[in-house]
């Protein structure tokens, strides 16, 4: 999960319905962005948005993100819910984070995504 403070300049966008959409900007407010592990824990009830920041080079923009992550030893799986089957296999956060970081460098690894842990439903 990310808690993001944004000053008075907008720029955060989310990809939805096949296009980039600006996030409604409210000055001096906090934006909460749920990440991949929250999507897995919630079994897709709370999807992690694909997002980006578009910078206006004529205006100064300040943001202060705070990232909250589980312990590296934590195994992440959908929380128990008897009404639906789990959509993901268990993911170790430390291994996942390491593989994501490796994927940032072409010569070290592949860009791992949570969809690689999705369980196919018949």
Spans of model-derived segments:
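C-terminal flanking tails of non-heme Fe-dependent oxygenases
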Residues: 1-122
